[in-house]
Amino acid sequence: MSLSGGVTVFDRDPGLNPDVPVLGIVGLKRSGKDTAAQALVDQGWTRMAFADPLKEMAMKLRGVWVEVPEGVHLDAAVPVMRDSSGHGGSFAQYHYVVDALGMEAAKDLVPDVRRLLQTLGTDCVRGTFGGTAWVDLMERKIRQALSNGESVVIPDVRFHEEFDLIARLGGDVIGVWRGDDTSLADLVFHNIAPKGGDEHESERNAYELLLRTGFVIHNNGSIGDLYGEMCDLF
């Protein structure tokens, strides 16, 4: 274990290749995956995400309402239906909520947004068309980017098929963890996953995938610390 600024690094693979053409990032929600990827985008890498087509698909849905918790404020132009049960909050259509808040804020502030994406992407698409549905689509995009001489970073690796694709294309996958040192050490060295948290399949898989990586960054510092660690690595 080494320490760099506010970022603890658990390195099980000293041979991590800084010149990989494709880098995947795995971690739980809000662990800093997108921030880590942005550090490379700022250096000229191309960002892709397995969930991008899913998000585009979800934005085309109409008539899908999500519960907006009390205290979350939407633009006055967004049509809302007030909760008449006395619990506070309101309901609005998914695409209006995402337009008003932006995708990342919507996922954090309105839990139904994340749940809808998980259900549509995993339970519906993967459940109906198989585990490689999103992988097959992404592989074509990655190969095209690589043929153009681009380096690709993918901050949303959630399934073993996605991990395997990156390895097959000559890439590496690293982990990003936000939490206490003890829980990370338990996971990395003793295969003990923390209790509680999101129980959806896509989140549960993150624990297994973190164990498959050879390199886990403990993101317990500032954004600048995380940027610095990514730039040092790649």
What are these regions (language model features)?
Residues D34:
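Walker A/P-loop
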Residues N17-L23, G149-E150:
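Pre-Walker A (Motif I) flank of P-loop NTPase domains
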Residues I25, I154:
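Hydrophobic anchor at the beta1->P-loop junction of P-loop NTPases
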Residues L28-S31:
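ATP-binding Walker
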